[in-house]
């Protein structure tokens, strides 16, 4: 029998803490290690980087209300930097749905009827024809929330179609409906969730992990833990200095969610999250409010993409992508 979710979590807490310290300890702004290319394909934005001899190609899928620019958010950039350093290229584009929730289509596994799957196949052909990506270049996928559901659909459909899909990372999301039956997902998969996520609660993700593991598909499950409010994570945001990071923390403490020691004192996590958004930040950081919100959500361990697991994800990918 697989281990229960509680032991899984407890066994990983210490390792997660070490990895997290490695991510944030330096307090340095996260910027692209290589220049990202901005282009369009069939009218949709594309952000990408392809080295001369790519070891593999990462497809990055945003969550609801997202776009190709997901690649340029602090945590995404940190993840991509790590993988680029290991020889990968990446591509990030936007979902076909550009109104409403701007989500990926996760209800259909048809490579023709599903507009996202169809366009991504054409985009891949374009990359093979115009960059150093070859038809045989190993492919991995990373998705957040709705993008996590989509990466499970895309990964399995592409694997079934003969594409060299080697592994995927589903962050803060469940397996998409067409592949949700136990044993249907055969692509090696990392699942990750956060202990306080009330948008996509951990329970169903844990169930997906257990079902995938019992079916014999290589899989791992990572949890993000809540941590005390500190200024260091905000130093990861380009343009924010230590004085501003301290002011950000002061503004968040002033909402009443945390005490002066950075400990959350509003017990209900949904109330705490709603209260935190009322913070009045200094005018000098007005252009970075989205990134501030992201880093705050990470400390609260709610629904947010995180780079804290990138070392483990890279090691997982390494098992299936040759050097």
Residue ranges, per PLM feature:
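C-terminal catalytic histidine-bearing segment of alpha/beta-hydrolase fold enzymes
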Residues: 217-323
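Short beta-strand element of the alpha/beta-hydrolase
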Residues: 55-63
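The feature captures the conserved acid-bearing segment of alpha/beta-hydrolase catalytic domains
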Residues: 166-249
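Alpha/beta-hydrolase active-site loop
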Residues: 107-131
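Primarily recognizes the serine-hydrolase "nucleophile elbow" in alpha/beta-hydrolase
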Residues: 136-186
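N-terminal cap/lid segment of alpha/beta-hydrolase-fold proteins
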Residues: 31-50
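Cap/lid segment of the alpha/beta-hydrolase catalytic domain
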Residues: 92-115
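Short amphipathic alpha-helix adjacent to the substrate-entry channel of hydrolases
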Residues: 72-88
